[in-house]
Each structure stands twice: as structure tokens, then as C-alpha cells.
């Protein structure tokens, strides 16, 4: 079957399509094994110190592991890329007929904190990914925004609906006790300095250069 990469990524994000994950791995790196190695290397670049991938879909393997902190680092990197940030916020997607499917397929997301009709809906949640295996229980990565502050919550080894209720409790605590504060404004650190060149012990003015940070700094 022929699908676009964007369609396959939606199948992975919304429906945890394991075969789609394997397909992407083979497309990108030639094999699942090579892709898993690639993922592990990239995770280390992001600062992950307790993560090792051996497959592309997250199914159980004793040598396939991570931590809540490492998953948060990976999620933080994803948020920097608008195209993936947008995909993670979607709750529904349609895949039109393909060379092997004659009917449109409708994908509905499983993350209940993004679903306005769910009792677990969290109005500030703007994206995330569910996960489940027998060994790991329910796992959940979610990010939410309020008043300019973005928080990422990762929960693991949850039973029943604990992954939703625990995530909501952590968000409530975070938004109640933390705020995004501007610690440096571009205007405060902008300076115009003269540029000169010395020739035969004489300074010649060449002009002026304005130096400033690229953006305000928040903490």
C-alpha cells in the first residue's frame, strides 16, 4: 500500500499503528534495527542518559527502556518543530482511498485529555501521545499551555485511568506554582557601538553596528 509520510505519522500518533512505525523505520534507515540505533543516538544528543531503543514501536523488550525525564526531554525537542507539534494536537484525521483501500479511513485519537467530549478532557492540554503494554501499563506524554507557560507531563506504569488523573493533578500543581518570567528583554541588551579601523596610528570611523539578542529570554 502506498501512503504519504504525513498519513503514516498520523496513524502512529492517533492509533499507535505498530506496522506503520516499522514502515517509517525501514523507509528512513533501511531497517528497524538501524532506526532504533539512530533513535538512541539522537536521544543521547538531547541529553537522555537512561534510554535505549531496540525497536520502532515501543513494544516490550528488556533492552528497550527509557525514563519519564528522558521522555520529557524528547517531547520538549518535538515542541520546537511546528509541523510535529501540530500533528500531536490533532484528534481526528482522514486517510483517503489508496491503491489498496477503496474507502476513506477515519482515525480518531486515543488521548482523552484532548477530547472535549471526554470526562478526562483538560482544556489547557494541546497535545500528547498515549502508550500501553502489559509490562509497562498505561503511559502518557502530554503538554499543556496556560498564560504563556508550557508544561510537559510524563507518567508511566499507571492502572486504569490513573494516567489521566495523575497528569491532570501534575498540571494543576505546575500551573499553580510556576510561571514563565522574562529575565532578559531584547531592548535591555541592545547596544550600538562604533566600528573603527586603525591605519598608520590613526583611527578611521567605518560606521556603527547594533548588537542585540535574537529574542527575549524567559525562565
List each model region and its residues.
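Domain-terminus/edge residues, biased toward the C-terminal soluble/receptor-binding domains
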Residues: 48-49, 63-65, 69-219
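Active-site-adjacent loops and short helices of periplasmic peptidoglycan-processing enzymes
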Residues: 1-69, 73-82
